[in-house]
């Protein structure tokens, strides 16, 4: 693998730290000021300049791309902890208190989800109580389409993959990452099992071997919630 390709990937993702020599690398707490269009409109550029004054040997302040929190702009990520509707005083307080870990909000956990009928449909599909034809008919009748831009009918997509002979996998893009998109983070932080059950239903329908979930590093809260809840289910 050419070093140029490694460098290309490493410099593309904002959460990689590029250093000239690993011997000189000093792990620090990184403070990232979102510089998306929305945050810029709410004064992110001036905020970045002000917060730069807080830099020391343990704190590094850098700009960062859209963090999926456009509804609470401007936002600043202190370590893994987000300061929403941020200002200098709020960020300084968070740094002084060494509050670097992600905040975990109240959400629907696996026991609460199951009490309200969660995973019943997935289990019925897995056990054949609900047939693949019934699933396909429901998808087609609903008119559900992909949200990635092409608007491809979900039922047709599942049918094509289901008929494929060979190893199959479900790959879930947890967030598209474009500016203004915070709907994914919002429901994943509040109702994660609706998402997980949907992934399982897709995997049972196409007879997938595994489900892979991609989640951007800007969503540490979602990552922790999903890991904790998946561990409970295992």
How would you label these PLM feature ranges?
Residues 1-234:
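Feature of Fe-S/electron-transfer and energy-metabolism proteins
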């Amino acid at each position: 693998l050419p070093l140029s390709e490694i460098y290309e990937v490493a410099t593309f993702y904002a959460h990689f730290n590029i250093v000239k020599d690993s011997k000189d690398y000093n792990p620090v707490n990184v403070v990232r000021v979102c510089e998306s269009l929305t945050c810029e409109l709410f004064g992110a550029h001036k905020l970045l300049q002000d917060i730069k004054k807080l830099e020391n040997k343990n704190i590094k302040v850098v700009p960062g791309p859209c963090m999926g929190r456009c509804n609470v702009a401007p936002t600043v990520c202190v370590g893994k902890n987000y300061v929403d509707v941020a200002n200098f005083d709020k960020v300084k307080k968070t740094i002084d208190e060494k509050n670097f870990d992600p905040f975990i909000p109240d959400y629907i956990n696996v026991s609460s989800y199951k009490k309200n009928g969660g995973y019943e449909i997935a289990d019925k599909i897995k056990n054949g109580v609900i047939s693949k034809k019934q699933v396909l008919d429901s998808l087609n009748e609903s008119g559900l389409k992909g949200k990635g831009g092409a608007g491809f009918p979900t039922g047709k997509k599942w049918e094509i993959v289901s008929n494929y002979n060979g190893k199959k996998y479900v790959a879930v893009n947890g967030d598209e990452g474009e500016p203004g998109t915070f709907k994914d983070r919002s429901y994943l932080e509040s109702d994660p099992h609706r998402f997980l059950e949907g992934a399982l239903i897709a995997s049972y329908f196409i007879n997938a071997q595994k489900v892979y979930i991609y989640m951007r590093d800007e969503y540490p809260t979602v990552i922790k919630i999903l890991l904790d809840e998946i561990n409970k289910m295992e």
